[in-house]
Amino acid sequence: MSDLTETTAGAMLGLTMSCCRCHDHKTDPLSHADHYRLRAFFAACHYADDVAIDLHADQKAIRNHNQKQDAEIKRVQKSIDEIESTVLARQTVKVEPKKSKELMTSVELAQVAMAESELESLKKGKRPLTNGLLMHDKMDSVQPIFVLFSGDHRTPKDAVEPGFPSVLFPNTPILVKPLKSTTTGRRLTLARWIASRENPWAARVIVNRIWQNYFGNGIVATPNDFGVTGALPSHPELLDYLAMELMDSGWSLKHIHRLIVTSSTYRQQTVADQATHATQATRGGHEFATLRTQLRRKSAEQLRDSILHVSGLLQERAGGPPVWPVLDDATLAANPAVLDDNATKTKGWYPSPPSEQSVRSLYLIQKRTIRIPWMETFDLPENAVSCGKRECSLVAPQSLAMMNGSLSVQAAQRIAETILGDVPSSKNQQIHTAFRQILLRNPNDQEFASCRTFLESRTLVELCLVLLNTNEFAFIE
């Protein structure tokens, strides 16, 4: 409940409520009780993480498939049991079943080994249903919420009702209960207040996140903290203007996106000239950087998707169940909970078939306890906490992953195969095609000469790998 409360406050309101779990906020006008008043909106929530979210037709197909697998598993297991029974029946003295392998002939051992291998393959071939997290209200089981002394559940103090931050809304709100509804209306009341003009935070927080996504820096540099300890807005009038535009347009995100990308600010170059750098030094780095797109590396997801796209490996799809990537043994060993054979979908790890792995990163499963190693190398944040702004590091493992990783190597091989199929004999055309496919431009004279020299002793695959490792490919300009 604390995570839910604090994530809602940070993501939607730009407020840090973690301090208020134990005491009044040290800097912001948020009281100890405000945390628990906000938490009370979720008091009637119940969770279920074993609800199948596949389409009914898909669920039926999965169950039919698993029934066939179970029948085959039963058949193979029966053949193993029969061999063991035959071995035990030959003995003149009673032998424990677990020692039957010691008494088998070489032929019987081979038969059992083959059957056990088939059994393991059949078990791996079973397809689990895709489970989702479901949240719902129960009218008859609303737990009272108490202010906890120092955040300790063993020392409850005063009971509280659902309420918004008291600095803005000191009175207890009237809960909205839909007609003929069996829910409490608490979450609906909170949602309506968040998306209303009575709430001065949500619109600012949303437009600031959109601005940050385009320019690399938000108008407020701390997107999850609009309080006293957070950064001041570099251009408060701009922030309020965009917030008003969002509300006046009926909370249309499309309108804000269009407003930003059609502005002259968005059309500025990423790299500034010498005079502009001098202006930056006099006006302050963040204030200047806010109004110009920053040269920055693509996010982990963007970089992976770009590699798959330029190589032609990307599987275009819209919607569908998540894809479970293949993880190395070291990653799985570091998370023993996912290796439990009896675990449910939310606890285990079930790699999808190789033919389904090259989808957009949007469709890769995300678990709180595990980060995909390749993407973690490129600063994929932890899944357990809300991340307002990603850090961008430059470390050696990133270069190694791009140069030696299976994703980059496989992509370079596919690009080279495609080019050789189109222009098998002309190295000049191969160079131009590689540049156009990977960097979306032709090489200049110096680059072309260097590539010609490179191909005299190296392969086209290696040239494609080099182009995938350029800053021009990995960075957004």
List each model region and its residues.
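Sequence context surrounding c-type heme c attachment/ligation sites in exported
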Residues: 1-70, 375, 387
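Primarily short, surface-exposed interaction patches in extracytoplasmic proteins
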Residues: 1, 29, 68-356, 381-393, ...
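C-terminal or internal capping secondary-structure element at the end of a domain, subdomain, or sheet
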Residues: 465-466
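Extracellular structured ligand-interaction cores
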Residues: 5, 35, 187, 304, ...
